[in-house]
Amino acid sequence: MKKYLILDFGKVLAYHKTGDWFITPLFLELIDMDKLNREDILKAMSNFSDILSRKATTLEEEYSIFYDFYKNTFNILNYSVSEEILENLAIDFTYTDHKYGFYDDIYNELDILKNKYILILLSDNWPCCNPIMDERNLSKYFDKIYISSFYGTKKSNGDFFDILINEYNIKPGEAYFVDDNESLLDIAKEKNLDVRQMDREGVVVSSKHEIIHDLKYFY
């Protein structure tokens, strides 16, 4: 019998408004996209996963991460930006939530599910996730929220799952895990979690895991 429902944040509770997590609405306002190709930007950003993987437990530490992240991204693109723009981009990512949209039915889904499961959030994310969850009145649904930067790890390392599993003493067959990323579900399955792949937008053609389109599946 399932006792726990472990959820990812991105594409399960929330989505990015611009199509990419790090290209925020403010990014599109401040950066001349006629001079930069989006694919080139994303390719440049992919070089700095080490920066994004730094341990951060405060918003100030997160700000430093994203200041360095954007600075290095523009350096590799040979695109000149002012100090003010770098600061504004880092502030925007860390201290605002307008970059995210939340699925319309998420409150009703969680309100029902909290009476059936122990709800846990497991997210590759940064300290900004906590105030965002609070401001959107979502934290109250979760028994605990695990943010990867607090532990200096991420789901792809596997040990992030171990932290949660050990703290709750979760036995095989006791927990569902929902994520939109097939490779992360592979890792979760190795940890004896019963996995489902979320596809709220209906874009996944096939997967080795069972595909769901909302959290009503778990009612």
Language-model features and meaning:
Residues 31-47, 75-91, 172:
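Short, surface-exposed acidic
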Residues 62-69, 98-105, 156:
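Soluble or luminal CAZymes and related metallo-dependent hydrolases
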Residues 83-102, 106-134:
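Substrate-recognition element of Asp-dependent hydrolases with the DxDx(T/V) motif
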Residues 31-35, 78, 116-117, 137, ...:
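Glycine-centered loop/turn motif at secondary-structure junctions
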Residues 22-29, 47, 68-72, 105-108, ...:
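Alpha-helical elements of Rossmann-like donor-binding domains used by nucleotide-donor carbohydrate transfer enzymes
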Residues 1-47, 190-191:
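Active-site neighborhood of HAD-like aspartate-dependent phosphohydrolases
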Residues 50-90:
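A metal-dependent, Asp-based hydrolase signature
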Residues 1-7, 126-219:
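Asp-based, Mg2+/Mn2+-dependent phosphohydrolase catalytic module
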